[in-house]
């Protein structure tokens, strides 16, 4: 428990600020709102549940955003709450803005707590029966910790148009190495490294291919995800403000799960659903049932009035 890792998402592309602070403001539109929810291991034990909300906005000089997540795991209700602010800057590398680099920073508060009274210890067994009134003999210095968290990231983008682009980035989190131990001994949280590549290729007027990958490493633990989705545009769609599309994808988390995803885009809205099919050594207990996840996104556009060079005067003037 004391060596716990950071949370993760199967729909990693649909939580962009959590993935890399350089993603702040990197979208078509003016303001972006995102909500995510994940429920996993319900078939094994008390479900692990995570939800997050974020908002980010473009600005003239710097983009900025806010992210908050809440995670609760296990019988002891090990809870993590994090609230952070992000800022990023995009720099054009070519006159036509095809090539660009962005850099970002995330800063905020991380709070962790556990209900130590929910655990049972061997010292509470008197040789005949379990007695919860007996002392645990566990020297908890505290049952909660609040620390400062800091992260940075950078990303390169090649944008041909809205349906053809490549993005690759790297980010580092937990740079303050906060003490997360509940005992007297200091347990430092490991730095988390994220590397991601996202690609979109227009196949024809109706179909897009969207492969991507993400590699994360934190201490001795790492995670590799690879997969792709396809997007089909429904009649009445265009590349600007009216987008109606369906998405379906398959993803693989190495040595852990296969992930099936479905999504729908309608104008300014996106809803994505995914389900993890567990393939790890936990299969006998999980019966291949992993986690359900949902992502909801809304993008707000600031419409500008069209310039009219000529007006037709009424006959009575």
PLM feature spans:
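Subset of outer-membrane beta-barrel
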Residues: 5-317
């Amino acid at each position: 428990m004391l060596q716990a890792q950071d949370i993760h998402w199967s729909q990693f592309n649909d939580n962009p600020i959590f993935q890399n602070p350089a993603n702040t403001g990197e979208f078509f539109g003016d303001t972006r709102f995102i909500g995510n929810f994940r429920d996993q291991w319900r078939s094994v034990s008390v479900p692990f549940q995570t939800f997050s909300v974020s908002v980010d906005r473009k600005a003239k000089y710097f983009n900025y955003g806010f992210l908050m997540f809440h995670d609760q795991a296990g019988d002891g209700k090990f809870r993590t709450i994090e609230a952070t602010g992000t800022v990023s800057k995009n720099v054009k590398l070519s006159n036509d803005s095809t090539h660009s680099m962005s850099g970002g920073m995330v800063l905020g508060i991380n709070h962790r707590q556990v209900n130590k009274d929910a655990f049972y210890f061997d010292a509470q067994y008197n040789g005949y029966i379990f007695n919860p009134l007996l002392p645990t003999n566990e020297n908890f210095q505290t049952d909660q910790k609040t620390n400062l968290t800091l992260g940075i990231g950078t990303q390169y983008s090649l944008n041909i148009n809205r349906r053809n682009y490549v993005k690759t980035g790297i980010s580092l989190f937990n740079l303050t190495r906060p003490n997360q131990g509940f005992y007297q001994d200091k347990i430092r949280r490991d730095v988390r490294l994220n590397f991601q590549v996202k690609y979109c290729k227009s196949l024809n007027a109706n179909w897009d291919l969207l492969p991507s990958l993400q590699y994360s490493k934190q201490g001795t633990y790492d995670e590799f995800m690879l997969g792709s989705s396809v997007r089909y545009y429904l009649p009445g769609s265009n590349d600007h403000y009216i987008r109606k599309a369906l998405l379906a994808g398959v993803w693989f988390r190495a040595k852990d799960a296969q992930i099936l995803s479905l999504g729908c885009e309608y104008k300014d809205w996106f809803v994505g659903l995914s389900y993890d099919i567990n393939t790890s050594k936990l299969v006998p207990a999980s019966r291949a049932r992993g986690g359900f996840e949902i992502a909801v996104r809304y993008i707000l556009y600031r419409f500008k009035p069209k310039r009219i060079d000529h007006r037709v005067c009424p006959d009575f003037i």
